[in-house]
Design a protein with these regions (language model features):
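A structural signal for short hydrophobic beta-strand segments in well-ordered beta-sheet cores
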Residues: 176-179
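Flexible, small-/acidic-enriched active-site or ligand-binding loops
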Residues: 173, 229-256
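Hydrophobic, small-residue-rich alpha-helical packing segments that form membrane-like cores
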Residues: 166-170, 185
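Conserved small/polar residues in nucleotide/adenosyl-binding loops
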Residues: 259-261
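A short core secondary-structure module
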Residues: 184, 188-235
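Flexible, glycine-rich active-site loops centered on histidine and acidic residues
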Residues: 131-137, 159-160, 214
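Amphipathic, small/basic residue-rich leader segments at the start of a protein or domain
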Residues: 1-125, 136, 141-145, 149
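A short, Trp-centered hydrophobic/proline-enriched beta-strand micro-motif
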Residues: 153-162
Length: 261
């Protein structure tokens, strides 16, 4: 197992007046949590990762998990939850740990050293960003149906934005449309490199669409929640990043055809 060098916090650093915004040190308050995360990764996640890999060696479908893989992962997740190592990314105390972004960055740097650490502590993308969207602007019903199981680590999600024919990192270029017909939105479009849709546990999509083409360029877009099993949601196939398709989660080419929401 790879060993990582620990670089301790500098203790003799002195701030000049007015330099508070440039202080990028970890806070003293989060140090015990950070150390706990490191220990949990070493003692629980890394051994579990070996067992997880072995449990998947015999599977015939690369786009799935074996029951044994899910079992060992859930055991580690439940242990993390019991030890309070859960949902670090949300800044409020009710749904998250109440961490500042800087302190979370230190913890995230440790999570990134092990392929399954983030998921074990329910801090995997794109779920983290999707949960924050739901937590901040979701309705009570949306939070109960989608945010709650995401916070509990029971389901996975995807954020559906990138498109094949436009520079869609700029949302003003989005071409996928959602038109209001009666009391339903009808969605049509094509999406590229959608992370996580291949995961069989993915149950909800947050889809970036254009709903008001006549508005100012920055006000034409909306995000619509689309259940993964909605008729018209079609995965055309996996796409490759640095020669890898990252099965079973994947980065997918998708078509959205006459989806009614």
């Amino acid at each position: 197992m790879t060993k990582h060098t620990y670089i301790p916090r500098t203790t003799n650093y002195t701030l000049n007046p007015g330099d508070e915004l440039n202080d990028l040190r970890m806070s003293d308050q989060v140090r015990p949590l950070y150390d706990h995360v490191r220990k949990f990764i070493r003692d629980t996640v890394e051994p579990m990762s070996i067992e997880f890999a072995k449990a998947g060696e015999s599977k015939e479908d690369r786009w799935s998990f074996t029951p044994k893989q899910l079992e060992v992962l859930e055991v580690a997740k439940n242990k993390a939850k019991k030890e309070g190592l859960w949902n670090f990314f949300l800044p409020d105390d009710e749904t998250g740990q109440g961490l500042k972004n800087l302190d979370y960055a230190y913890i995230a740097s440790e999570l990134g050293k092990s392929p399954l650490a983030s998921e074990t502590m329910n801090c995997s993308a794109p779920d983290t960003g999707n949960m924050e969207v739901l937590e901040r602007v979701g309705t009570k019903e949306q939070k109960e149906k989608w945010l709650k199981p995401l916070l509990n680590g029971e389901i996975r999600s995807a954020y559906v934005m990138t498109e094949p024919n436009v520079a869609s990192s700029d949302a003003k270029n989005i071409s996928t449309t959602a038109k209001l017909v009666g009391d339903e939105w009808v969605i049509n479009g094509e999406k590229y490199y959608i992370s996580g849709v291949g995961d069989p546990r993915c149950k909800i999509l947050i889809v970036m669409v254009k709903t008001n083409p006549d508005a100012a360029p920055s006000k034409q877009q909306s995000q619509i929640l689309v259940p993964r099993d909605t008729p018209g949601v079609e995965v055309l196939g996996p796409m490759y990043v640095f020669g890898q398709d990252h099965a079973p989660r994947g980065h997918m080419h998708m078509r959205l055809s006459l989806i009614h929401i």
